[in-house]
């Protein structure tokens, strides 16, 4: 439902023609399987080319702009599930000062307790987070016309989701999925490298 709502909004605001910045160049690269300006964005070009082969019945530039809208809407869904996972595993620190006897000084007892939120509350909070993200100006702009950042938003959200999944579940398979998604992110846009320090700090 969240995906449908956000996607409908994106479709109504999507550009029907070539717009500013690299939109025309990237659309041409996707349609003709060409090479865009460095770094070339190979993953984006390949996926965009496959999408452009689908006979929608309207112009390729409009269909590619809708492709960006779908990718951005999908990133909102990933963020929704990431928020759900964080809220269901969140803990808060409880600090208590314990007074000691004459021979023993007082000390601080620190414990961690689960954030006691109902499933309904977790869903509502996650919905608000995802909608705020999806309708923020910077994110919304990526959904209106074809740009590499729409795919990058999806991939970076997937990296964050799986790295947290690996952290909470301690399952090796999610480490490998995280590495795979990070590689895909790098093959699309080099801003993916900004996630590496956060991943290293987490582990």
Where do the language-model regions lie?
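Aromatic- and kink-enriched transmembrane "portal" helix at the membrane-lumen/periplasm boundary
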Residues: 13, 54-61, 65, 98-119, ...
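Transmembrane-helix motifs of polytopic, lipid-linked glycan transferases
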Residues: 66-114, 155-165
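Extracytoplasmic catalytic/substrate-binding loops of multi-pass membrane glycan-assembly enzymes
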Residues: 14-26, 36-47
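Perimembrane helix-loop-helix junctions
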Residues: 195-203
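Membrane-water interface at transmembrane helix exits
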Residues: 9, 14, 48, 52, ...
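Transmembrane signal-anchor helices characteristic of membrane glycosylation enzymes that use polyprenol
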Residues: 1-20, 133-135, 189
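Membrane-interface alpha helices of multi-pass inner-membrane proteins
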Residues: 29-32, 129-131, 175-188
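Membrane-interface transmembrane helices that cradle and orient dolichyl/undecaprenyl
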Residues: 120, 143, 156-175, 182, ...
């Amino acid at each position: 439902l969240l995906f449908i709502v956000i996607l409908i909004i994106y479709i109504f605001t999507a550009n029907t023609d070539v717009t500013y910045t690299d939109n025309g160049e990237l659309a041409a690269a996707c349609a003709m399987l060409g090479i865009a300006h460095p770094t070339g964005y190979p993953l984006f070009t390949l996926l965009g080319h496959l999408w452009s082969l689908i006979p929608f019945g309207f112009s390729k530039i409009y269909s590619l702009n809708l492709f960006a809208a779908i990718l951005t809407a999908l990133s909102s869904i990933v963020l929704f599930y990431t928020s759900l996972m964080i809220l269901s595993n969140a803990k808060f620190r409880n600090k208590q000062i314990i007074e000691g006897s004459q021979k023993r000084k007082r000390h601080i007892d620190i414990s961690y307790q689960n954030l006691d939120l109902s499933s309904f509350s977790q869903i509502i909070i996650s919905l608000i987070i995802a909608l705020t993200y999806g309708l923020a100006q910077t994110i919304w702009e990526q959904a209106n016309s074809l740009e590499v950042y729409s795919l990058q938003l999806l991939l970076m959200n997937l990296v964050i989701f799986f790295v947290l999944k690996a952290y909470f579940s301690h399952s090796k398979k999610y480490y490998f999925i995280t590495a795979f998604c990070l590689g895909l992110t790098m093959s699309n846009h080099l801003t993916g490298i900004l996630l590496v320090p956060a991943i290293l700090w987490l582990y």
